[in-house]
Amino acid sequence: MASEQQIVRKDDLPEVGLDAVVSYIPSDIPVLQPVEIELVHLFDKLRAVKGFVFDVDGVFTNNNILITEAGELLRTMNVRDGQVVKWALQAGYQICIITGGRSEGTKKRLTGLGITEYYSGVSEKLPVFQAFLESSGLLSSEICYMGDDIPDIPVLRKVIVSSCPSDSVPEVMEICDYISPLPGGAGCVRDILEKVMKLQGKWPEY
């Protein structure tokens, strides 16, 4: 007979808004369906997260760039993403940005939220990611990474939780543990931060 630890009931799983349906499992039927097993494994991974690494374009922004007549490149960001970044930092999570872009406005916005690990103009992200691990003292098994395009794949393959916005390229979506229901620049950053913080009991109460 299966042990009690192998029995997962609906009430045992935290309500963190994950896009999955968990059926009620009576205590005398210790059987997990594939979707339930996958969900439990994801919860286990999310519980291990101590730090986050994000791409910028297509994650914090919507991948669109406005070009002024003077040639200035303008991007927009979601205010709610920024609010939860602040909460996550206050809760003790480390947050790092690794981006191929070089926007000073983007840097000012994100460092203004309290992010100190900001790396821009990066063509190969894996070496920078590994340098961040060394400087932070974190392990790849403690990192959630969110990216949306091909350059993010080497890092996505290294972390415990690989995540992406809903409008990511197919190659990224195929390998990610978690695909946010929200697109880049529209709350996907808040989505993954909120899920981890709620699952770990670090979401602020008001």
Predicted regions and their residues:
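Non-catalytic pre-domain segments flanking phosphatase-related domains
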Residues: 1-54, 205-206
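Asp-based phosphoryl-transfer active-site loop
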Residues: 48-65, 156, 189
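Short coil/turn segments at beta-strand junctions that form active-site/ligand-binding loops
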Residues: 48-50, 93, 141-142
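Short secondary-structure boundary segments
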Residues: 56, 100-101, 122, 166-169
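Short, basic/glycine-rich phosphate-binding loops at helix/coil junctions
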Residues: 60-67, 107-113
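Basic, amphipathic juxtamembrane/active-site segments
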Residues: 64-87
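Mg2+-dependent phosphoryl-transfer enzymes with acidic/Ser/Thr/Gly-rich catalytic loops
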Residues: 71-78, 112, 117-119, 126-206
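Substrate-recognition element of Asp-dependent hydrolases with the DxDx(T/V) motif
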Residues: 85-109, 156
